[in-house]
Amino acid sequence: DIITNELKEVKEQFATPRRTEIVEWSGDMEDEDLIEREDMVVTVTSGGYIKRTPLIDFRAQRRGGKGLAGMQTKDEDVVTTLFVANTHTQLLFFTTDGMAYKLKTWRLPLGGRTAKGKAIVNILPIPVGVSIAAIMPVDVEEKEWDNLQIVFATSAGDIRRNALSDFTNVRSNGKIAMDLNEGTELVNARIAGEEEDVMLFTDSGRAIRFSTTAVRVFKGRKSTGVRGIKLLGQDKVVSMSVIRHFIATPDERSAYLKMRRAVSGLVDEEINSDEDDVNENATISPERYAEMSASENLILTITSGGAGKLSSSHDYPVRGRGGMGVAAMDKTMRGGAIVASFPVELEDQIMLATSNGQSIRVPIEGISFRSRSAGGVKVFDTKENEEVVSVAWIADQGGDAEEGQQD
């Protein structure tokens, strides 16, 4: 009786009409239908761990927090990849051995800002000794993938272009993206339109820029493609980027870069000496300068010795593919082999990791602007027998994601 009376009191005090309705469901429901659409920060480490964390967690930690570098890793394990993707976004994974895998963001392990994450080998069937070369979020519906192209680059200097729809159907055990020769690795994979250019950088300090249309769209996936840049000796490609296409005459480029150097406070002697027909007396109209400035990409270059610089995309002439390219950094001043080179915005940050397990976060705006063939400035003060081994790009999230603290 006591229990009955207590339950009656609870009913009288808290009873409210049902707000939901129970109906018969005739359709099919997938797990994904129950997943809320939410922006996630996806983090990958050099030790092969991956996780997703709600972006709002980083916003809550903005004041006094450690921001995007807050995850727990071993001393030798550092963040190498970091980007924001929606829970329903398709992620294409490409490995250094030329395989492709596909997962939705929500299928990645969910972890807090300081969580370690889960080993990628427990999520994707990646062989020992193989690592992730690229992770590509694709927000476009799969039915539209046939209208997009994907560009691949290998360490041997080859490049290939395929329809993105070639990777619509990817089994759980993966799909061959590129049949690589022994000793060759996949360097990167990026979506590229016909109004964009491809840039390849080698570890010896060479760079080449050409239109994506210089590479035909391949029908198969096993070919290694065509030559993107001619390599000498033990040289190898270490970075591939896709930037805005822009054609300017040699005089326009010369005049623009002269004004750009003046704005950045560079000395007149710091010009590129590896180009023909450089006219230091060339002029450019204010309208053309504004047009070139609006289309400019800032190219970040980092070396194994910890040196780095920003340079103008207009400093890299558009040429045909297959050549030796131009100097991307002075041989006597670059401070080691080039580790990475890619376009950035001044609001972004980068995270550098060394062979000794040390890491540091650096705001892009603190890196000096230099001419293409000039040497870099010290970005990371490496010790003896220590080298920078990876550079992670941290895109700006409108000032909400983190505070910009260096670790």
Walk through the language-model features, giving the residues of each:
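C-terminal interaction appendages of subunits in large macromolecular complexes
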Residues: 1-407
